[in-house]
């Protein structure tokens, strides 16, 4: 199975620009949603895992608009990314899929699951969502961190 950059790279035109992605493997669909940051892309986030995932799933590494090699669009990156996931699924005829979201991709995955629950079979987030323990009133989060730091254990993780 060819899981190289050039061997997996695909693209298609939408009414909001060209979306690019990487595709590999057979099996149920798995959409991998990347994080944000300078130079980030689906390929950079997941290239090390693609070969293993592709043995069990039909993998899609979507490059969100304005990231990787996809065309930029106007609007907030998380909002445009979430709508691009649905456009992507519609264009490829994917009724529903498992999703893994890293960082911003986790937030995008949660947004997609909340807006279109029938389109998301399963969702795994990696550092993507959760309560902010450092809010203006962080008592509970601070208490949990202090308890863990005082006597770290597997159970307290």
Language-model segment annotations:
Residues 70, 103, 127:
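Catalytic nucleophile serine of serine hydrolases
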Residues 14-15, 51, 61-100:
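Active-site loop/oxyanion-hole signature of alpha/beta-hydrolase fold enzymes
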Residues 29, 56-58, 93-98, 119-122:
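Structural signature of beta-strand start/N-cap positions in the alpha/beta core
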Residues 34-36, 97, 101-106:
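Conserved alpha/beta-hydrolase "nucleophile elbow" surrounding the catalytic nucleophile
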Residues 107-115, 120-154:
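Flexible "cap/lid" loop of the alpha/beta hydrolase fold
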Residues 15-69:
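Conserved HGGG/HGGXW glycine-rich cap/lid loop of the alpha/beta-hydrolase fold
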Residues 1-18:
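N-terminal cap/lid segment of alpha/beta-hydrolase-fold proteins
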Residues 42-45, 70-76, 134-137:
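Conserved catalytic-core motifs of eukaryotic protein kinase domains, centered on the activation segment
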